[in-house]
Amino acid sequence: MIKKKNKKRYTEVSALGKYIPMSTHKARRVIDQIRGRSYEETLMILELMPYRACYPILKLISSAAANGIHNMNFDETSLIISKAEVNEGPTAKKFKPRAKGQSYPIKRSTCHITIVLRDISLNEKYEEYIRKPWALLEKSNETEIRKRN
């Protein structure tokens, strides 16, 4: 018996930014606003937000999109941000001299940001997402809750 190989088409691309000199709380404030949105909508949101964390996140999203367009032949209009997370990186510690021979610790925090883009044109539920973009996210949240329990 001859078995056919399943040609599985990958629908996700990612970009990872490590050791970004920024607090995780400040980066999460921006990441929470863009999670689940389309690529084009995300670019507009990040350009208009007044936070310093927007620039490195914008570069990461552009890098992930370029990976998908160049390596996987994805269409820019059908990309959504399926996963975006911020993890804590190492903290650089140094001391600043203060009055009367004392010292004060300075903690310089870093973070690791992961962005995963999904091409929804390859998904069977593409038409459903176009009509109701929130429905796809609600279903994925339900499956995550079921997996946890």
Curated annotation (Swiss-Prot):
Biological processes per GO annotation: translation
CDD domains: Ribosomal_L22 (cd00336)
Keyword terms, alphabetized: Chloroplast, Plastid, Ribonucleoprotein, Ribosomal protein, RNA-binding, rRNA-binding
PANTHER family tied to this protein: CHLOROPLAST 50S RIBOSOMAL PROTEIN L22-RELATED (PTHR13501), LARGE RIBOSOMAL SUBUNIT PROTEIN UL22M (PTHR13501:SF10)
Alphabetical list of HAMAP family matching this protein: Ribosomal_uL22_B
Subunit structure, as described in the record: Part of the 50S ribosomal subunit.
Family per similarity comment: Belongs to the universal ribosomal protein uL22 family.
Record's protein name: Large ribosomal subunit protein uL22c
Gene: rpl22-A
